[in-house]
Structures are given as C-alpha cells and as structure tokens.
Amino acid sequence: MMNDFELSLKSLGVSFTSKSIDKLRFYIEKVLLFGTRFNLVSNNDRNFDAVLLHVLDSVAGLPIIKDKNPRQVLDVGSGAGFPGIVLALFDNFRKYILLERSNKKATFLRMISLELGLDNIEVLERDVDKEQNKYEFITIRAFRDIREYARILKLILKDGGLIVAYKGKLNKIKFEVSHIESLFNKIEIKSSTMNDGKERNFLLLYK
C-alpha cells in the first residue's frame, strides 16, 4: 500500500524523499504502538493500512496550504497528529502549531515530534475556547457538524484569515454551509481526487 501512497503524493504534487517515507513509517508504527495507551485511534483503525488512510486524508490538504502560503498553521484538535504531524513532515517551509486539549495526546504529539526531528512543530495543550491568540490559517479535521465550532474558530482567526476544514461527502457539507454562510466573508468547497477513489472535500471559510 505504500507504493499507492507514494503515487498519491505525486498526484498531489507533494515532494518526498526516501527519508521522509521512512519517517512516515516510523510515525505510523508509533501510532499503532501507543494507540491504546494514549487513545490515539479507534479499535477498527489499529492496523498499518488503516492508519495510512488517515495519513492520506491528512496530506490531501497540503496543496491548499502551499497555494495560500501562510507563515504558520494552527491545527485544532490534532489528536494522533492527523493532519498536523503529517503536514509538518511533508512541509518544512512553515511552522505548525498543534492545539490538543487531551494531556495524553499532547504528550504523544510532543514525543513523536522530537523523535521525528520536526523542529517546525509547537504543541499547545488546551481547549480551543481557551486560546487567546489569533491565527492567519487554521486547519481542523471536522467529523462533526461545522456549526458546532465555526463561531469558536472565527474568534481566533485573524481578519483576512482562512479556516480549512477537512470534510467528507459533498451533500452533507452543503447542508452545513447553509447554516453558517452569514458568519464568513466567503465560503468555498474544494475537492481532492486521488487514486484510491475516496471522496475528500475541504471547506474553506474566509474571514
């Protein structure tokens, strides 16, 4: 499956080396090793290929980040490092700030960042509604309804800033967007097509 993953990276225009792929393997192995202790992934995802799919979902957002070219990115609710660790691994041109409220998961994020030698990562251990700083670019893997967190994220978004929410099926996104249109200056939906055939969409919220 790693060969398919490398083909997906190429289709996205994401540069990689044998060293970055080795680091990725190491990262996935650590997620599996500490998965139970730190509650990193669900029971159904505790195998290499399942975690690799999370990695693929994460890296799919990198072309948007490179296109917008922010100085730094705040990743809200990083969990096991999807997408924050993965993005930082394949993009050392900017700083990634990983916001995670769980002590166990924040501890894992700090540990794996050091072991991978990712000096472009900072981990903040707190809830998003306790965050006081404002950011130009925010990512979130948004399994829940966007209405649950759109207002909170807008409060920590700089004027002219952008929130990129990793989402799934298009019809569900359109329903959610209809309830938050008045909150943002502009809303876009971008899709990502890769060779695994999975539907991946991104919700772009401009302040």
From Swiss-Prot:
Name of this chain's protein: Ribosomal RNA small subunit methyltransferase G
CDD domains: AdoMet_MTases
Record keywords: Cytoplasm, Methyltransferase, rRNA processing, S-adenosyl-L-methionine, Transferase
HAMAP family to which the protein is assigned, alphabetical: 16SrRNA_methyltr_G (MF_00074)
Name of the gene encoding the protein in the UniProt record: rsmG
Cell compartment(s), UniProt: Cytoplasm
Family that this chain belongs to: Belongs to the methyltransferase superfamily. RNA methyltransferase RsmG family.
Sequence positions that bind S-adenosyl-L-methionine: 77, 82, 100-102, 141
